[in-house]
Amino acid sequence: MSAKTIIQITDRGDPRIAPFIGVRERDLTGGADGRFIVEGKVPLSILLTQSRFEVDSLFLCETRLAPLASLLKDVPKGVPIYTAPQSLMDEIAGFPIHRGILACARKGSQMDLSAILSGQRILVLNQLSNHDNVGAAFRNAAAFGVDGIIVDSQSCDPLYRKAIRVSSGASLWLPFHHGGRGEDHVSALKAEGFAVWAMTPRTDAAALYAQPVPDKLAIVLGAEGPGLPDGLIAAAHPVRIPMSPGFDSVNVATAGAIALAHVFSAEH
């Protein structure tokens, strides 16, 4: 720990910890300054060891320094580690940071869509505005071997603090492209030879378990409630998950997990 830059914070107005002031308000800005916040031990570990993102600084409750000593060895040289008592940290952040662990990182350049299209298994998120659902979708994608994720411009940022936490840090290392329209994504995927499954509860859609798994496959998930736009479904291959009579849908992240598990089990 002696080789690391440990800085004790005693004043909530200290400009050095500006990125951590009012974390929830920062969430609302969507990281307009090109930085984002990571919360918790597991996401921090991934940020330091597996992520493609550059770490700016850490802000830890002083009681967390010793328990995190082995992990903090992975903090890049020159990255400051700010520390404060729990009460001051909570005051600075604007709410109780029960885990006592925050980090600030830089988004860097957007990953190009062509990099995602080089994979074989792609997940596409269309108009998912719920951070929990986006985070869970990333976690499921990581669990079932997805190569990359395409997130349309109307979906929430996968680097939103809560989305990162719910993803168990998967959004920090799993390749993704954020932007554009779902219909355009489907066209780009088909042009690259992908079969595109549009997950929908429509009764005229093909049953998931009857589908052979193609070599190149993209699975598209839409928002709960409205689902996928009709035009997007028409441009893809509509697929439904068979369910008990009288029930036609599950949570979007659950639907994604079921579809991805079907594909994964067919290959393993």
Show which residues each predicted segment covers.
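Active-site/ligand-binding-proximal alpha/beta "capping" segment
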Residues: 197-247
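Amphipathic alpha-helical repeat scaffolds
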Residues: 40, 129-137, 250-255
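Short acidic-hydrophobic, aromatic-tinged amphipathic segments that line or gate anion-handling sites
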Residues: 7-11, 80-85, 174-182
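Boundary-proximal intrinsically disordered activation/regulatory segments immediately upstream
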Residues: 1-67, 155-157
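Short, aromatic/basic amphipathic alpha-helical patches
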Residues: 66-78, 231-232
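RNA substrate-binding interface of SAM-dependent RNA methyltransferases
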Residues: 108-204
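Structured adenosyl-cofactor binding patch, chiefly the S-adenosyl-L-methionine
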Residues: 100-103, 140-144, 158-171, 230-268
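Short beta->alpha connector loops at strand-helix junctions that form conserved
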Residues: 84-85, 126, 152-153, 175, ...
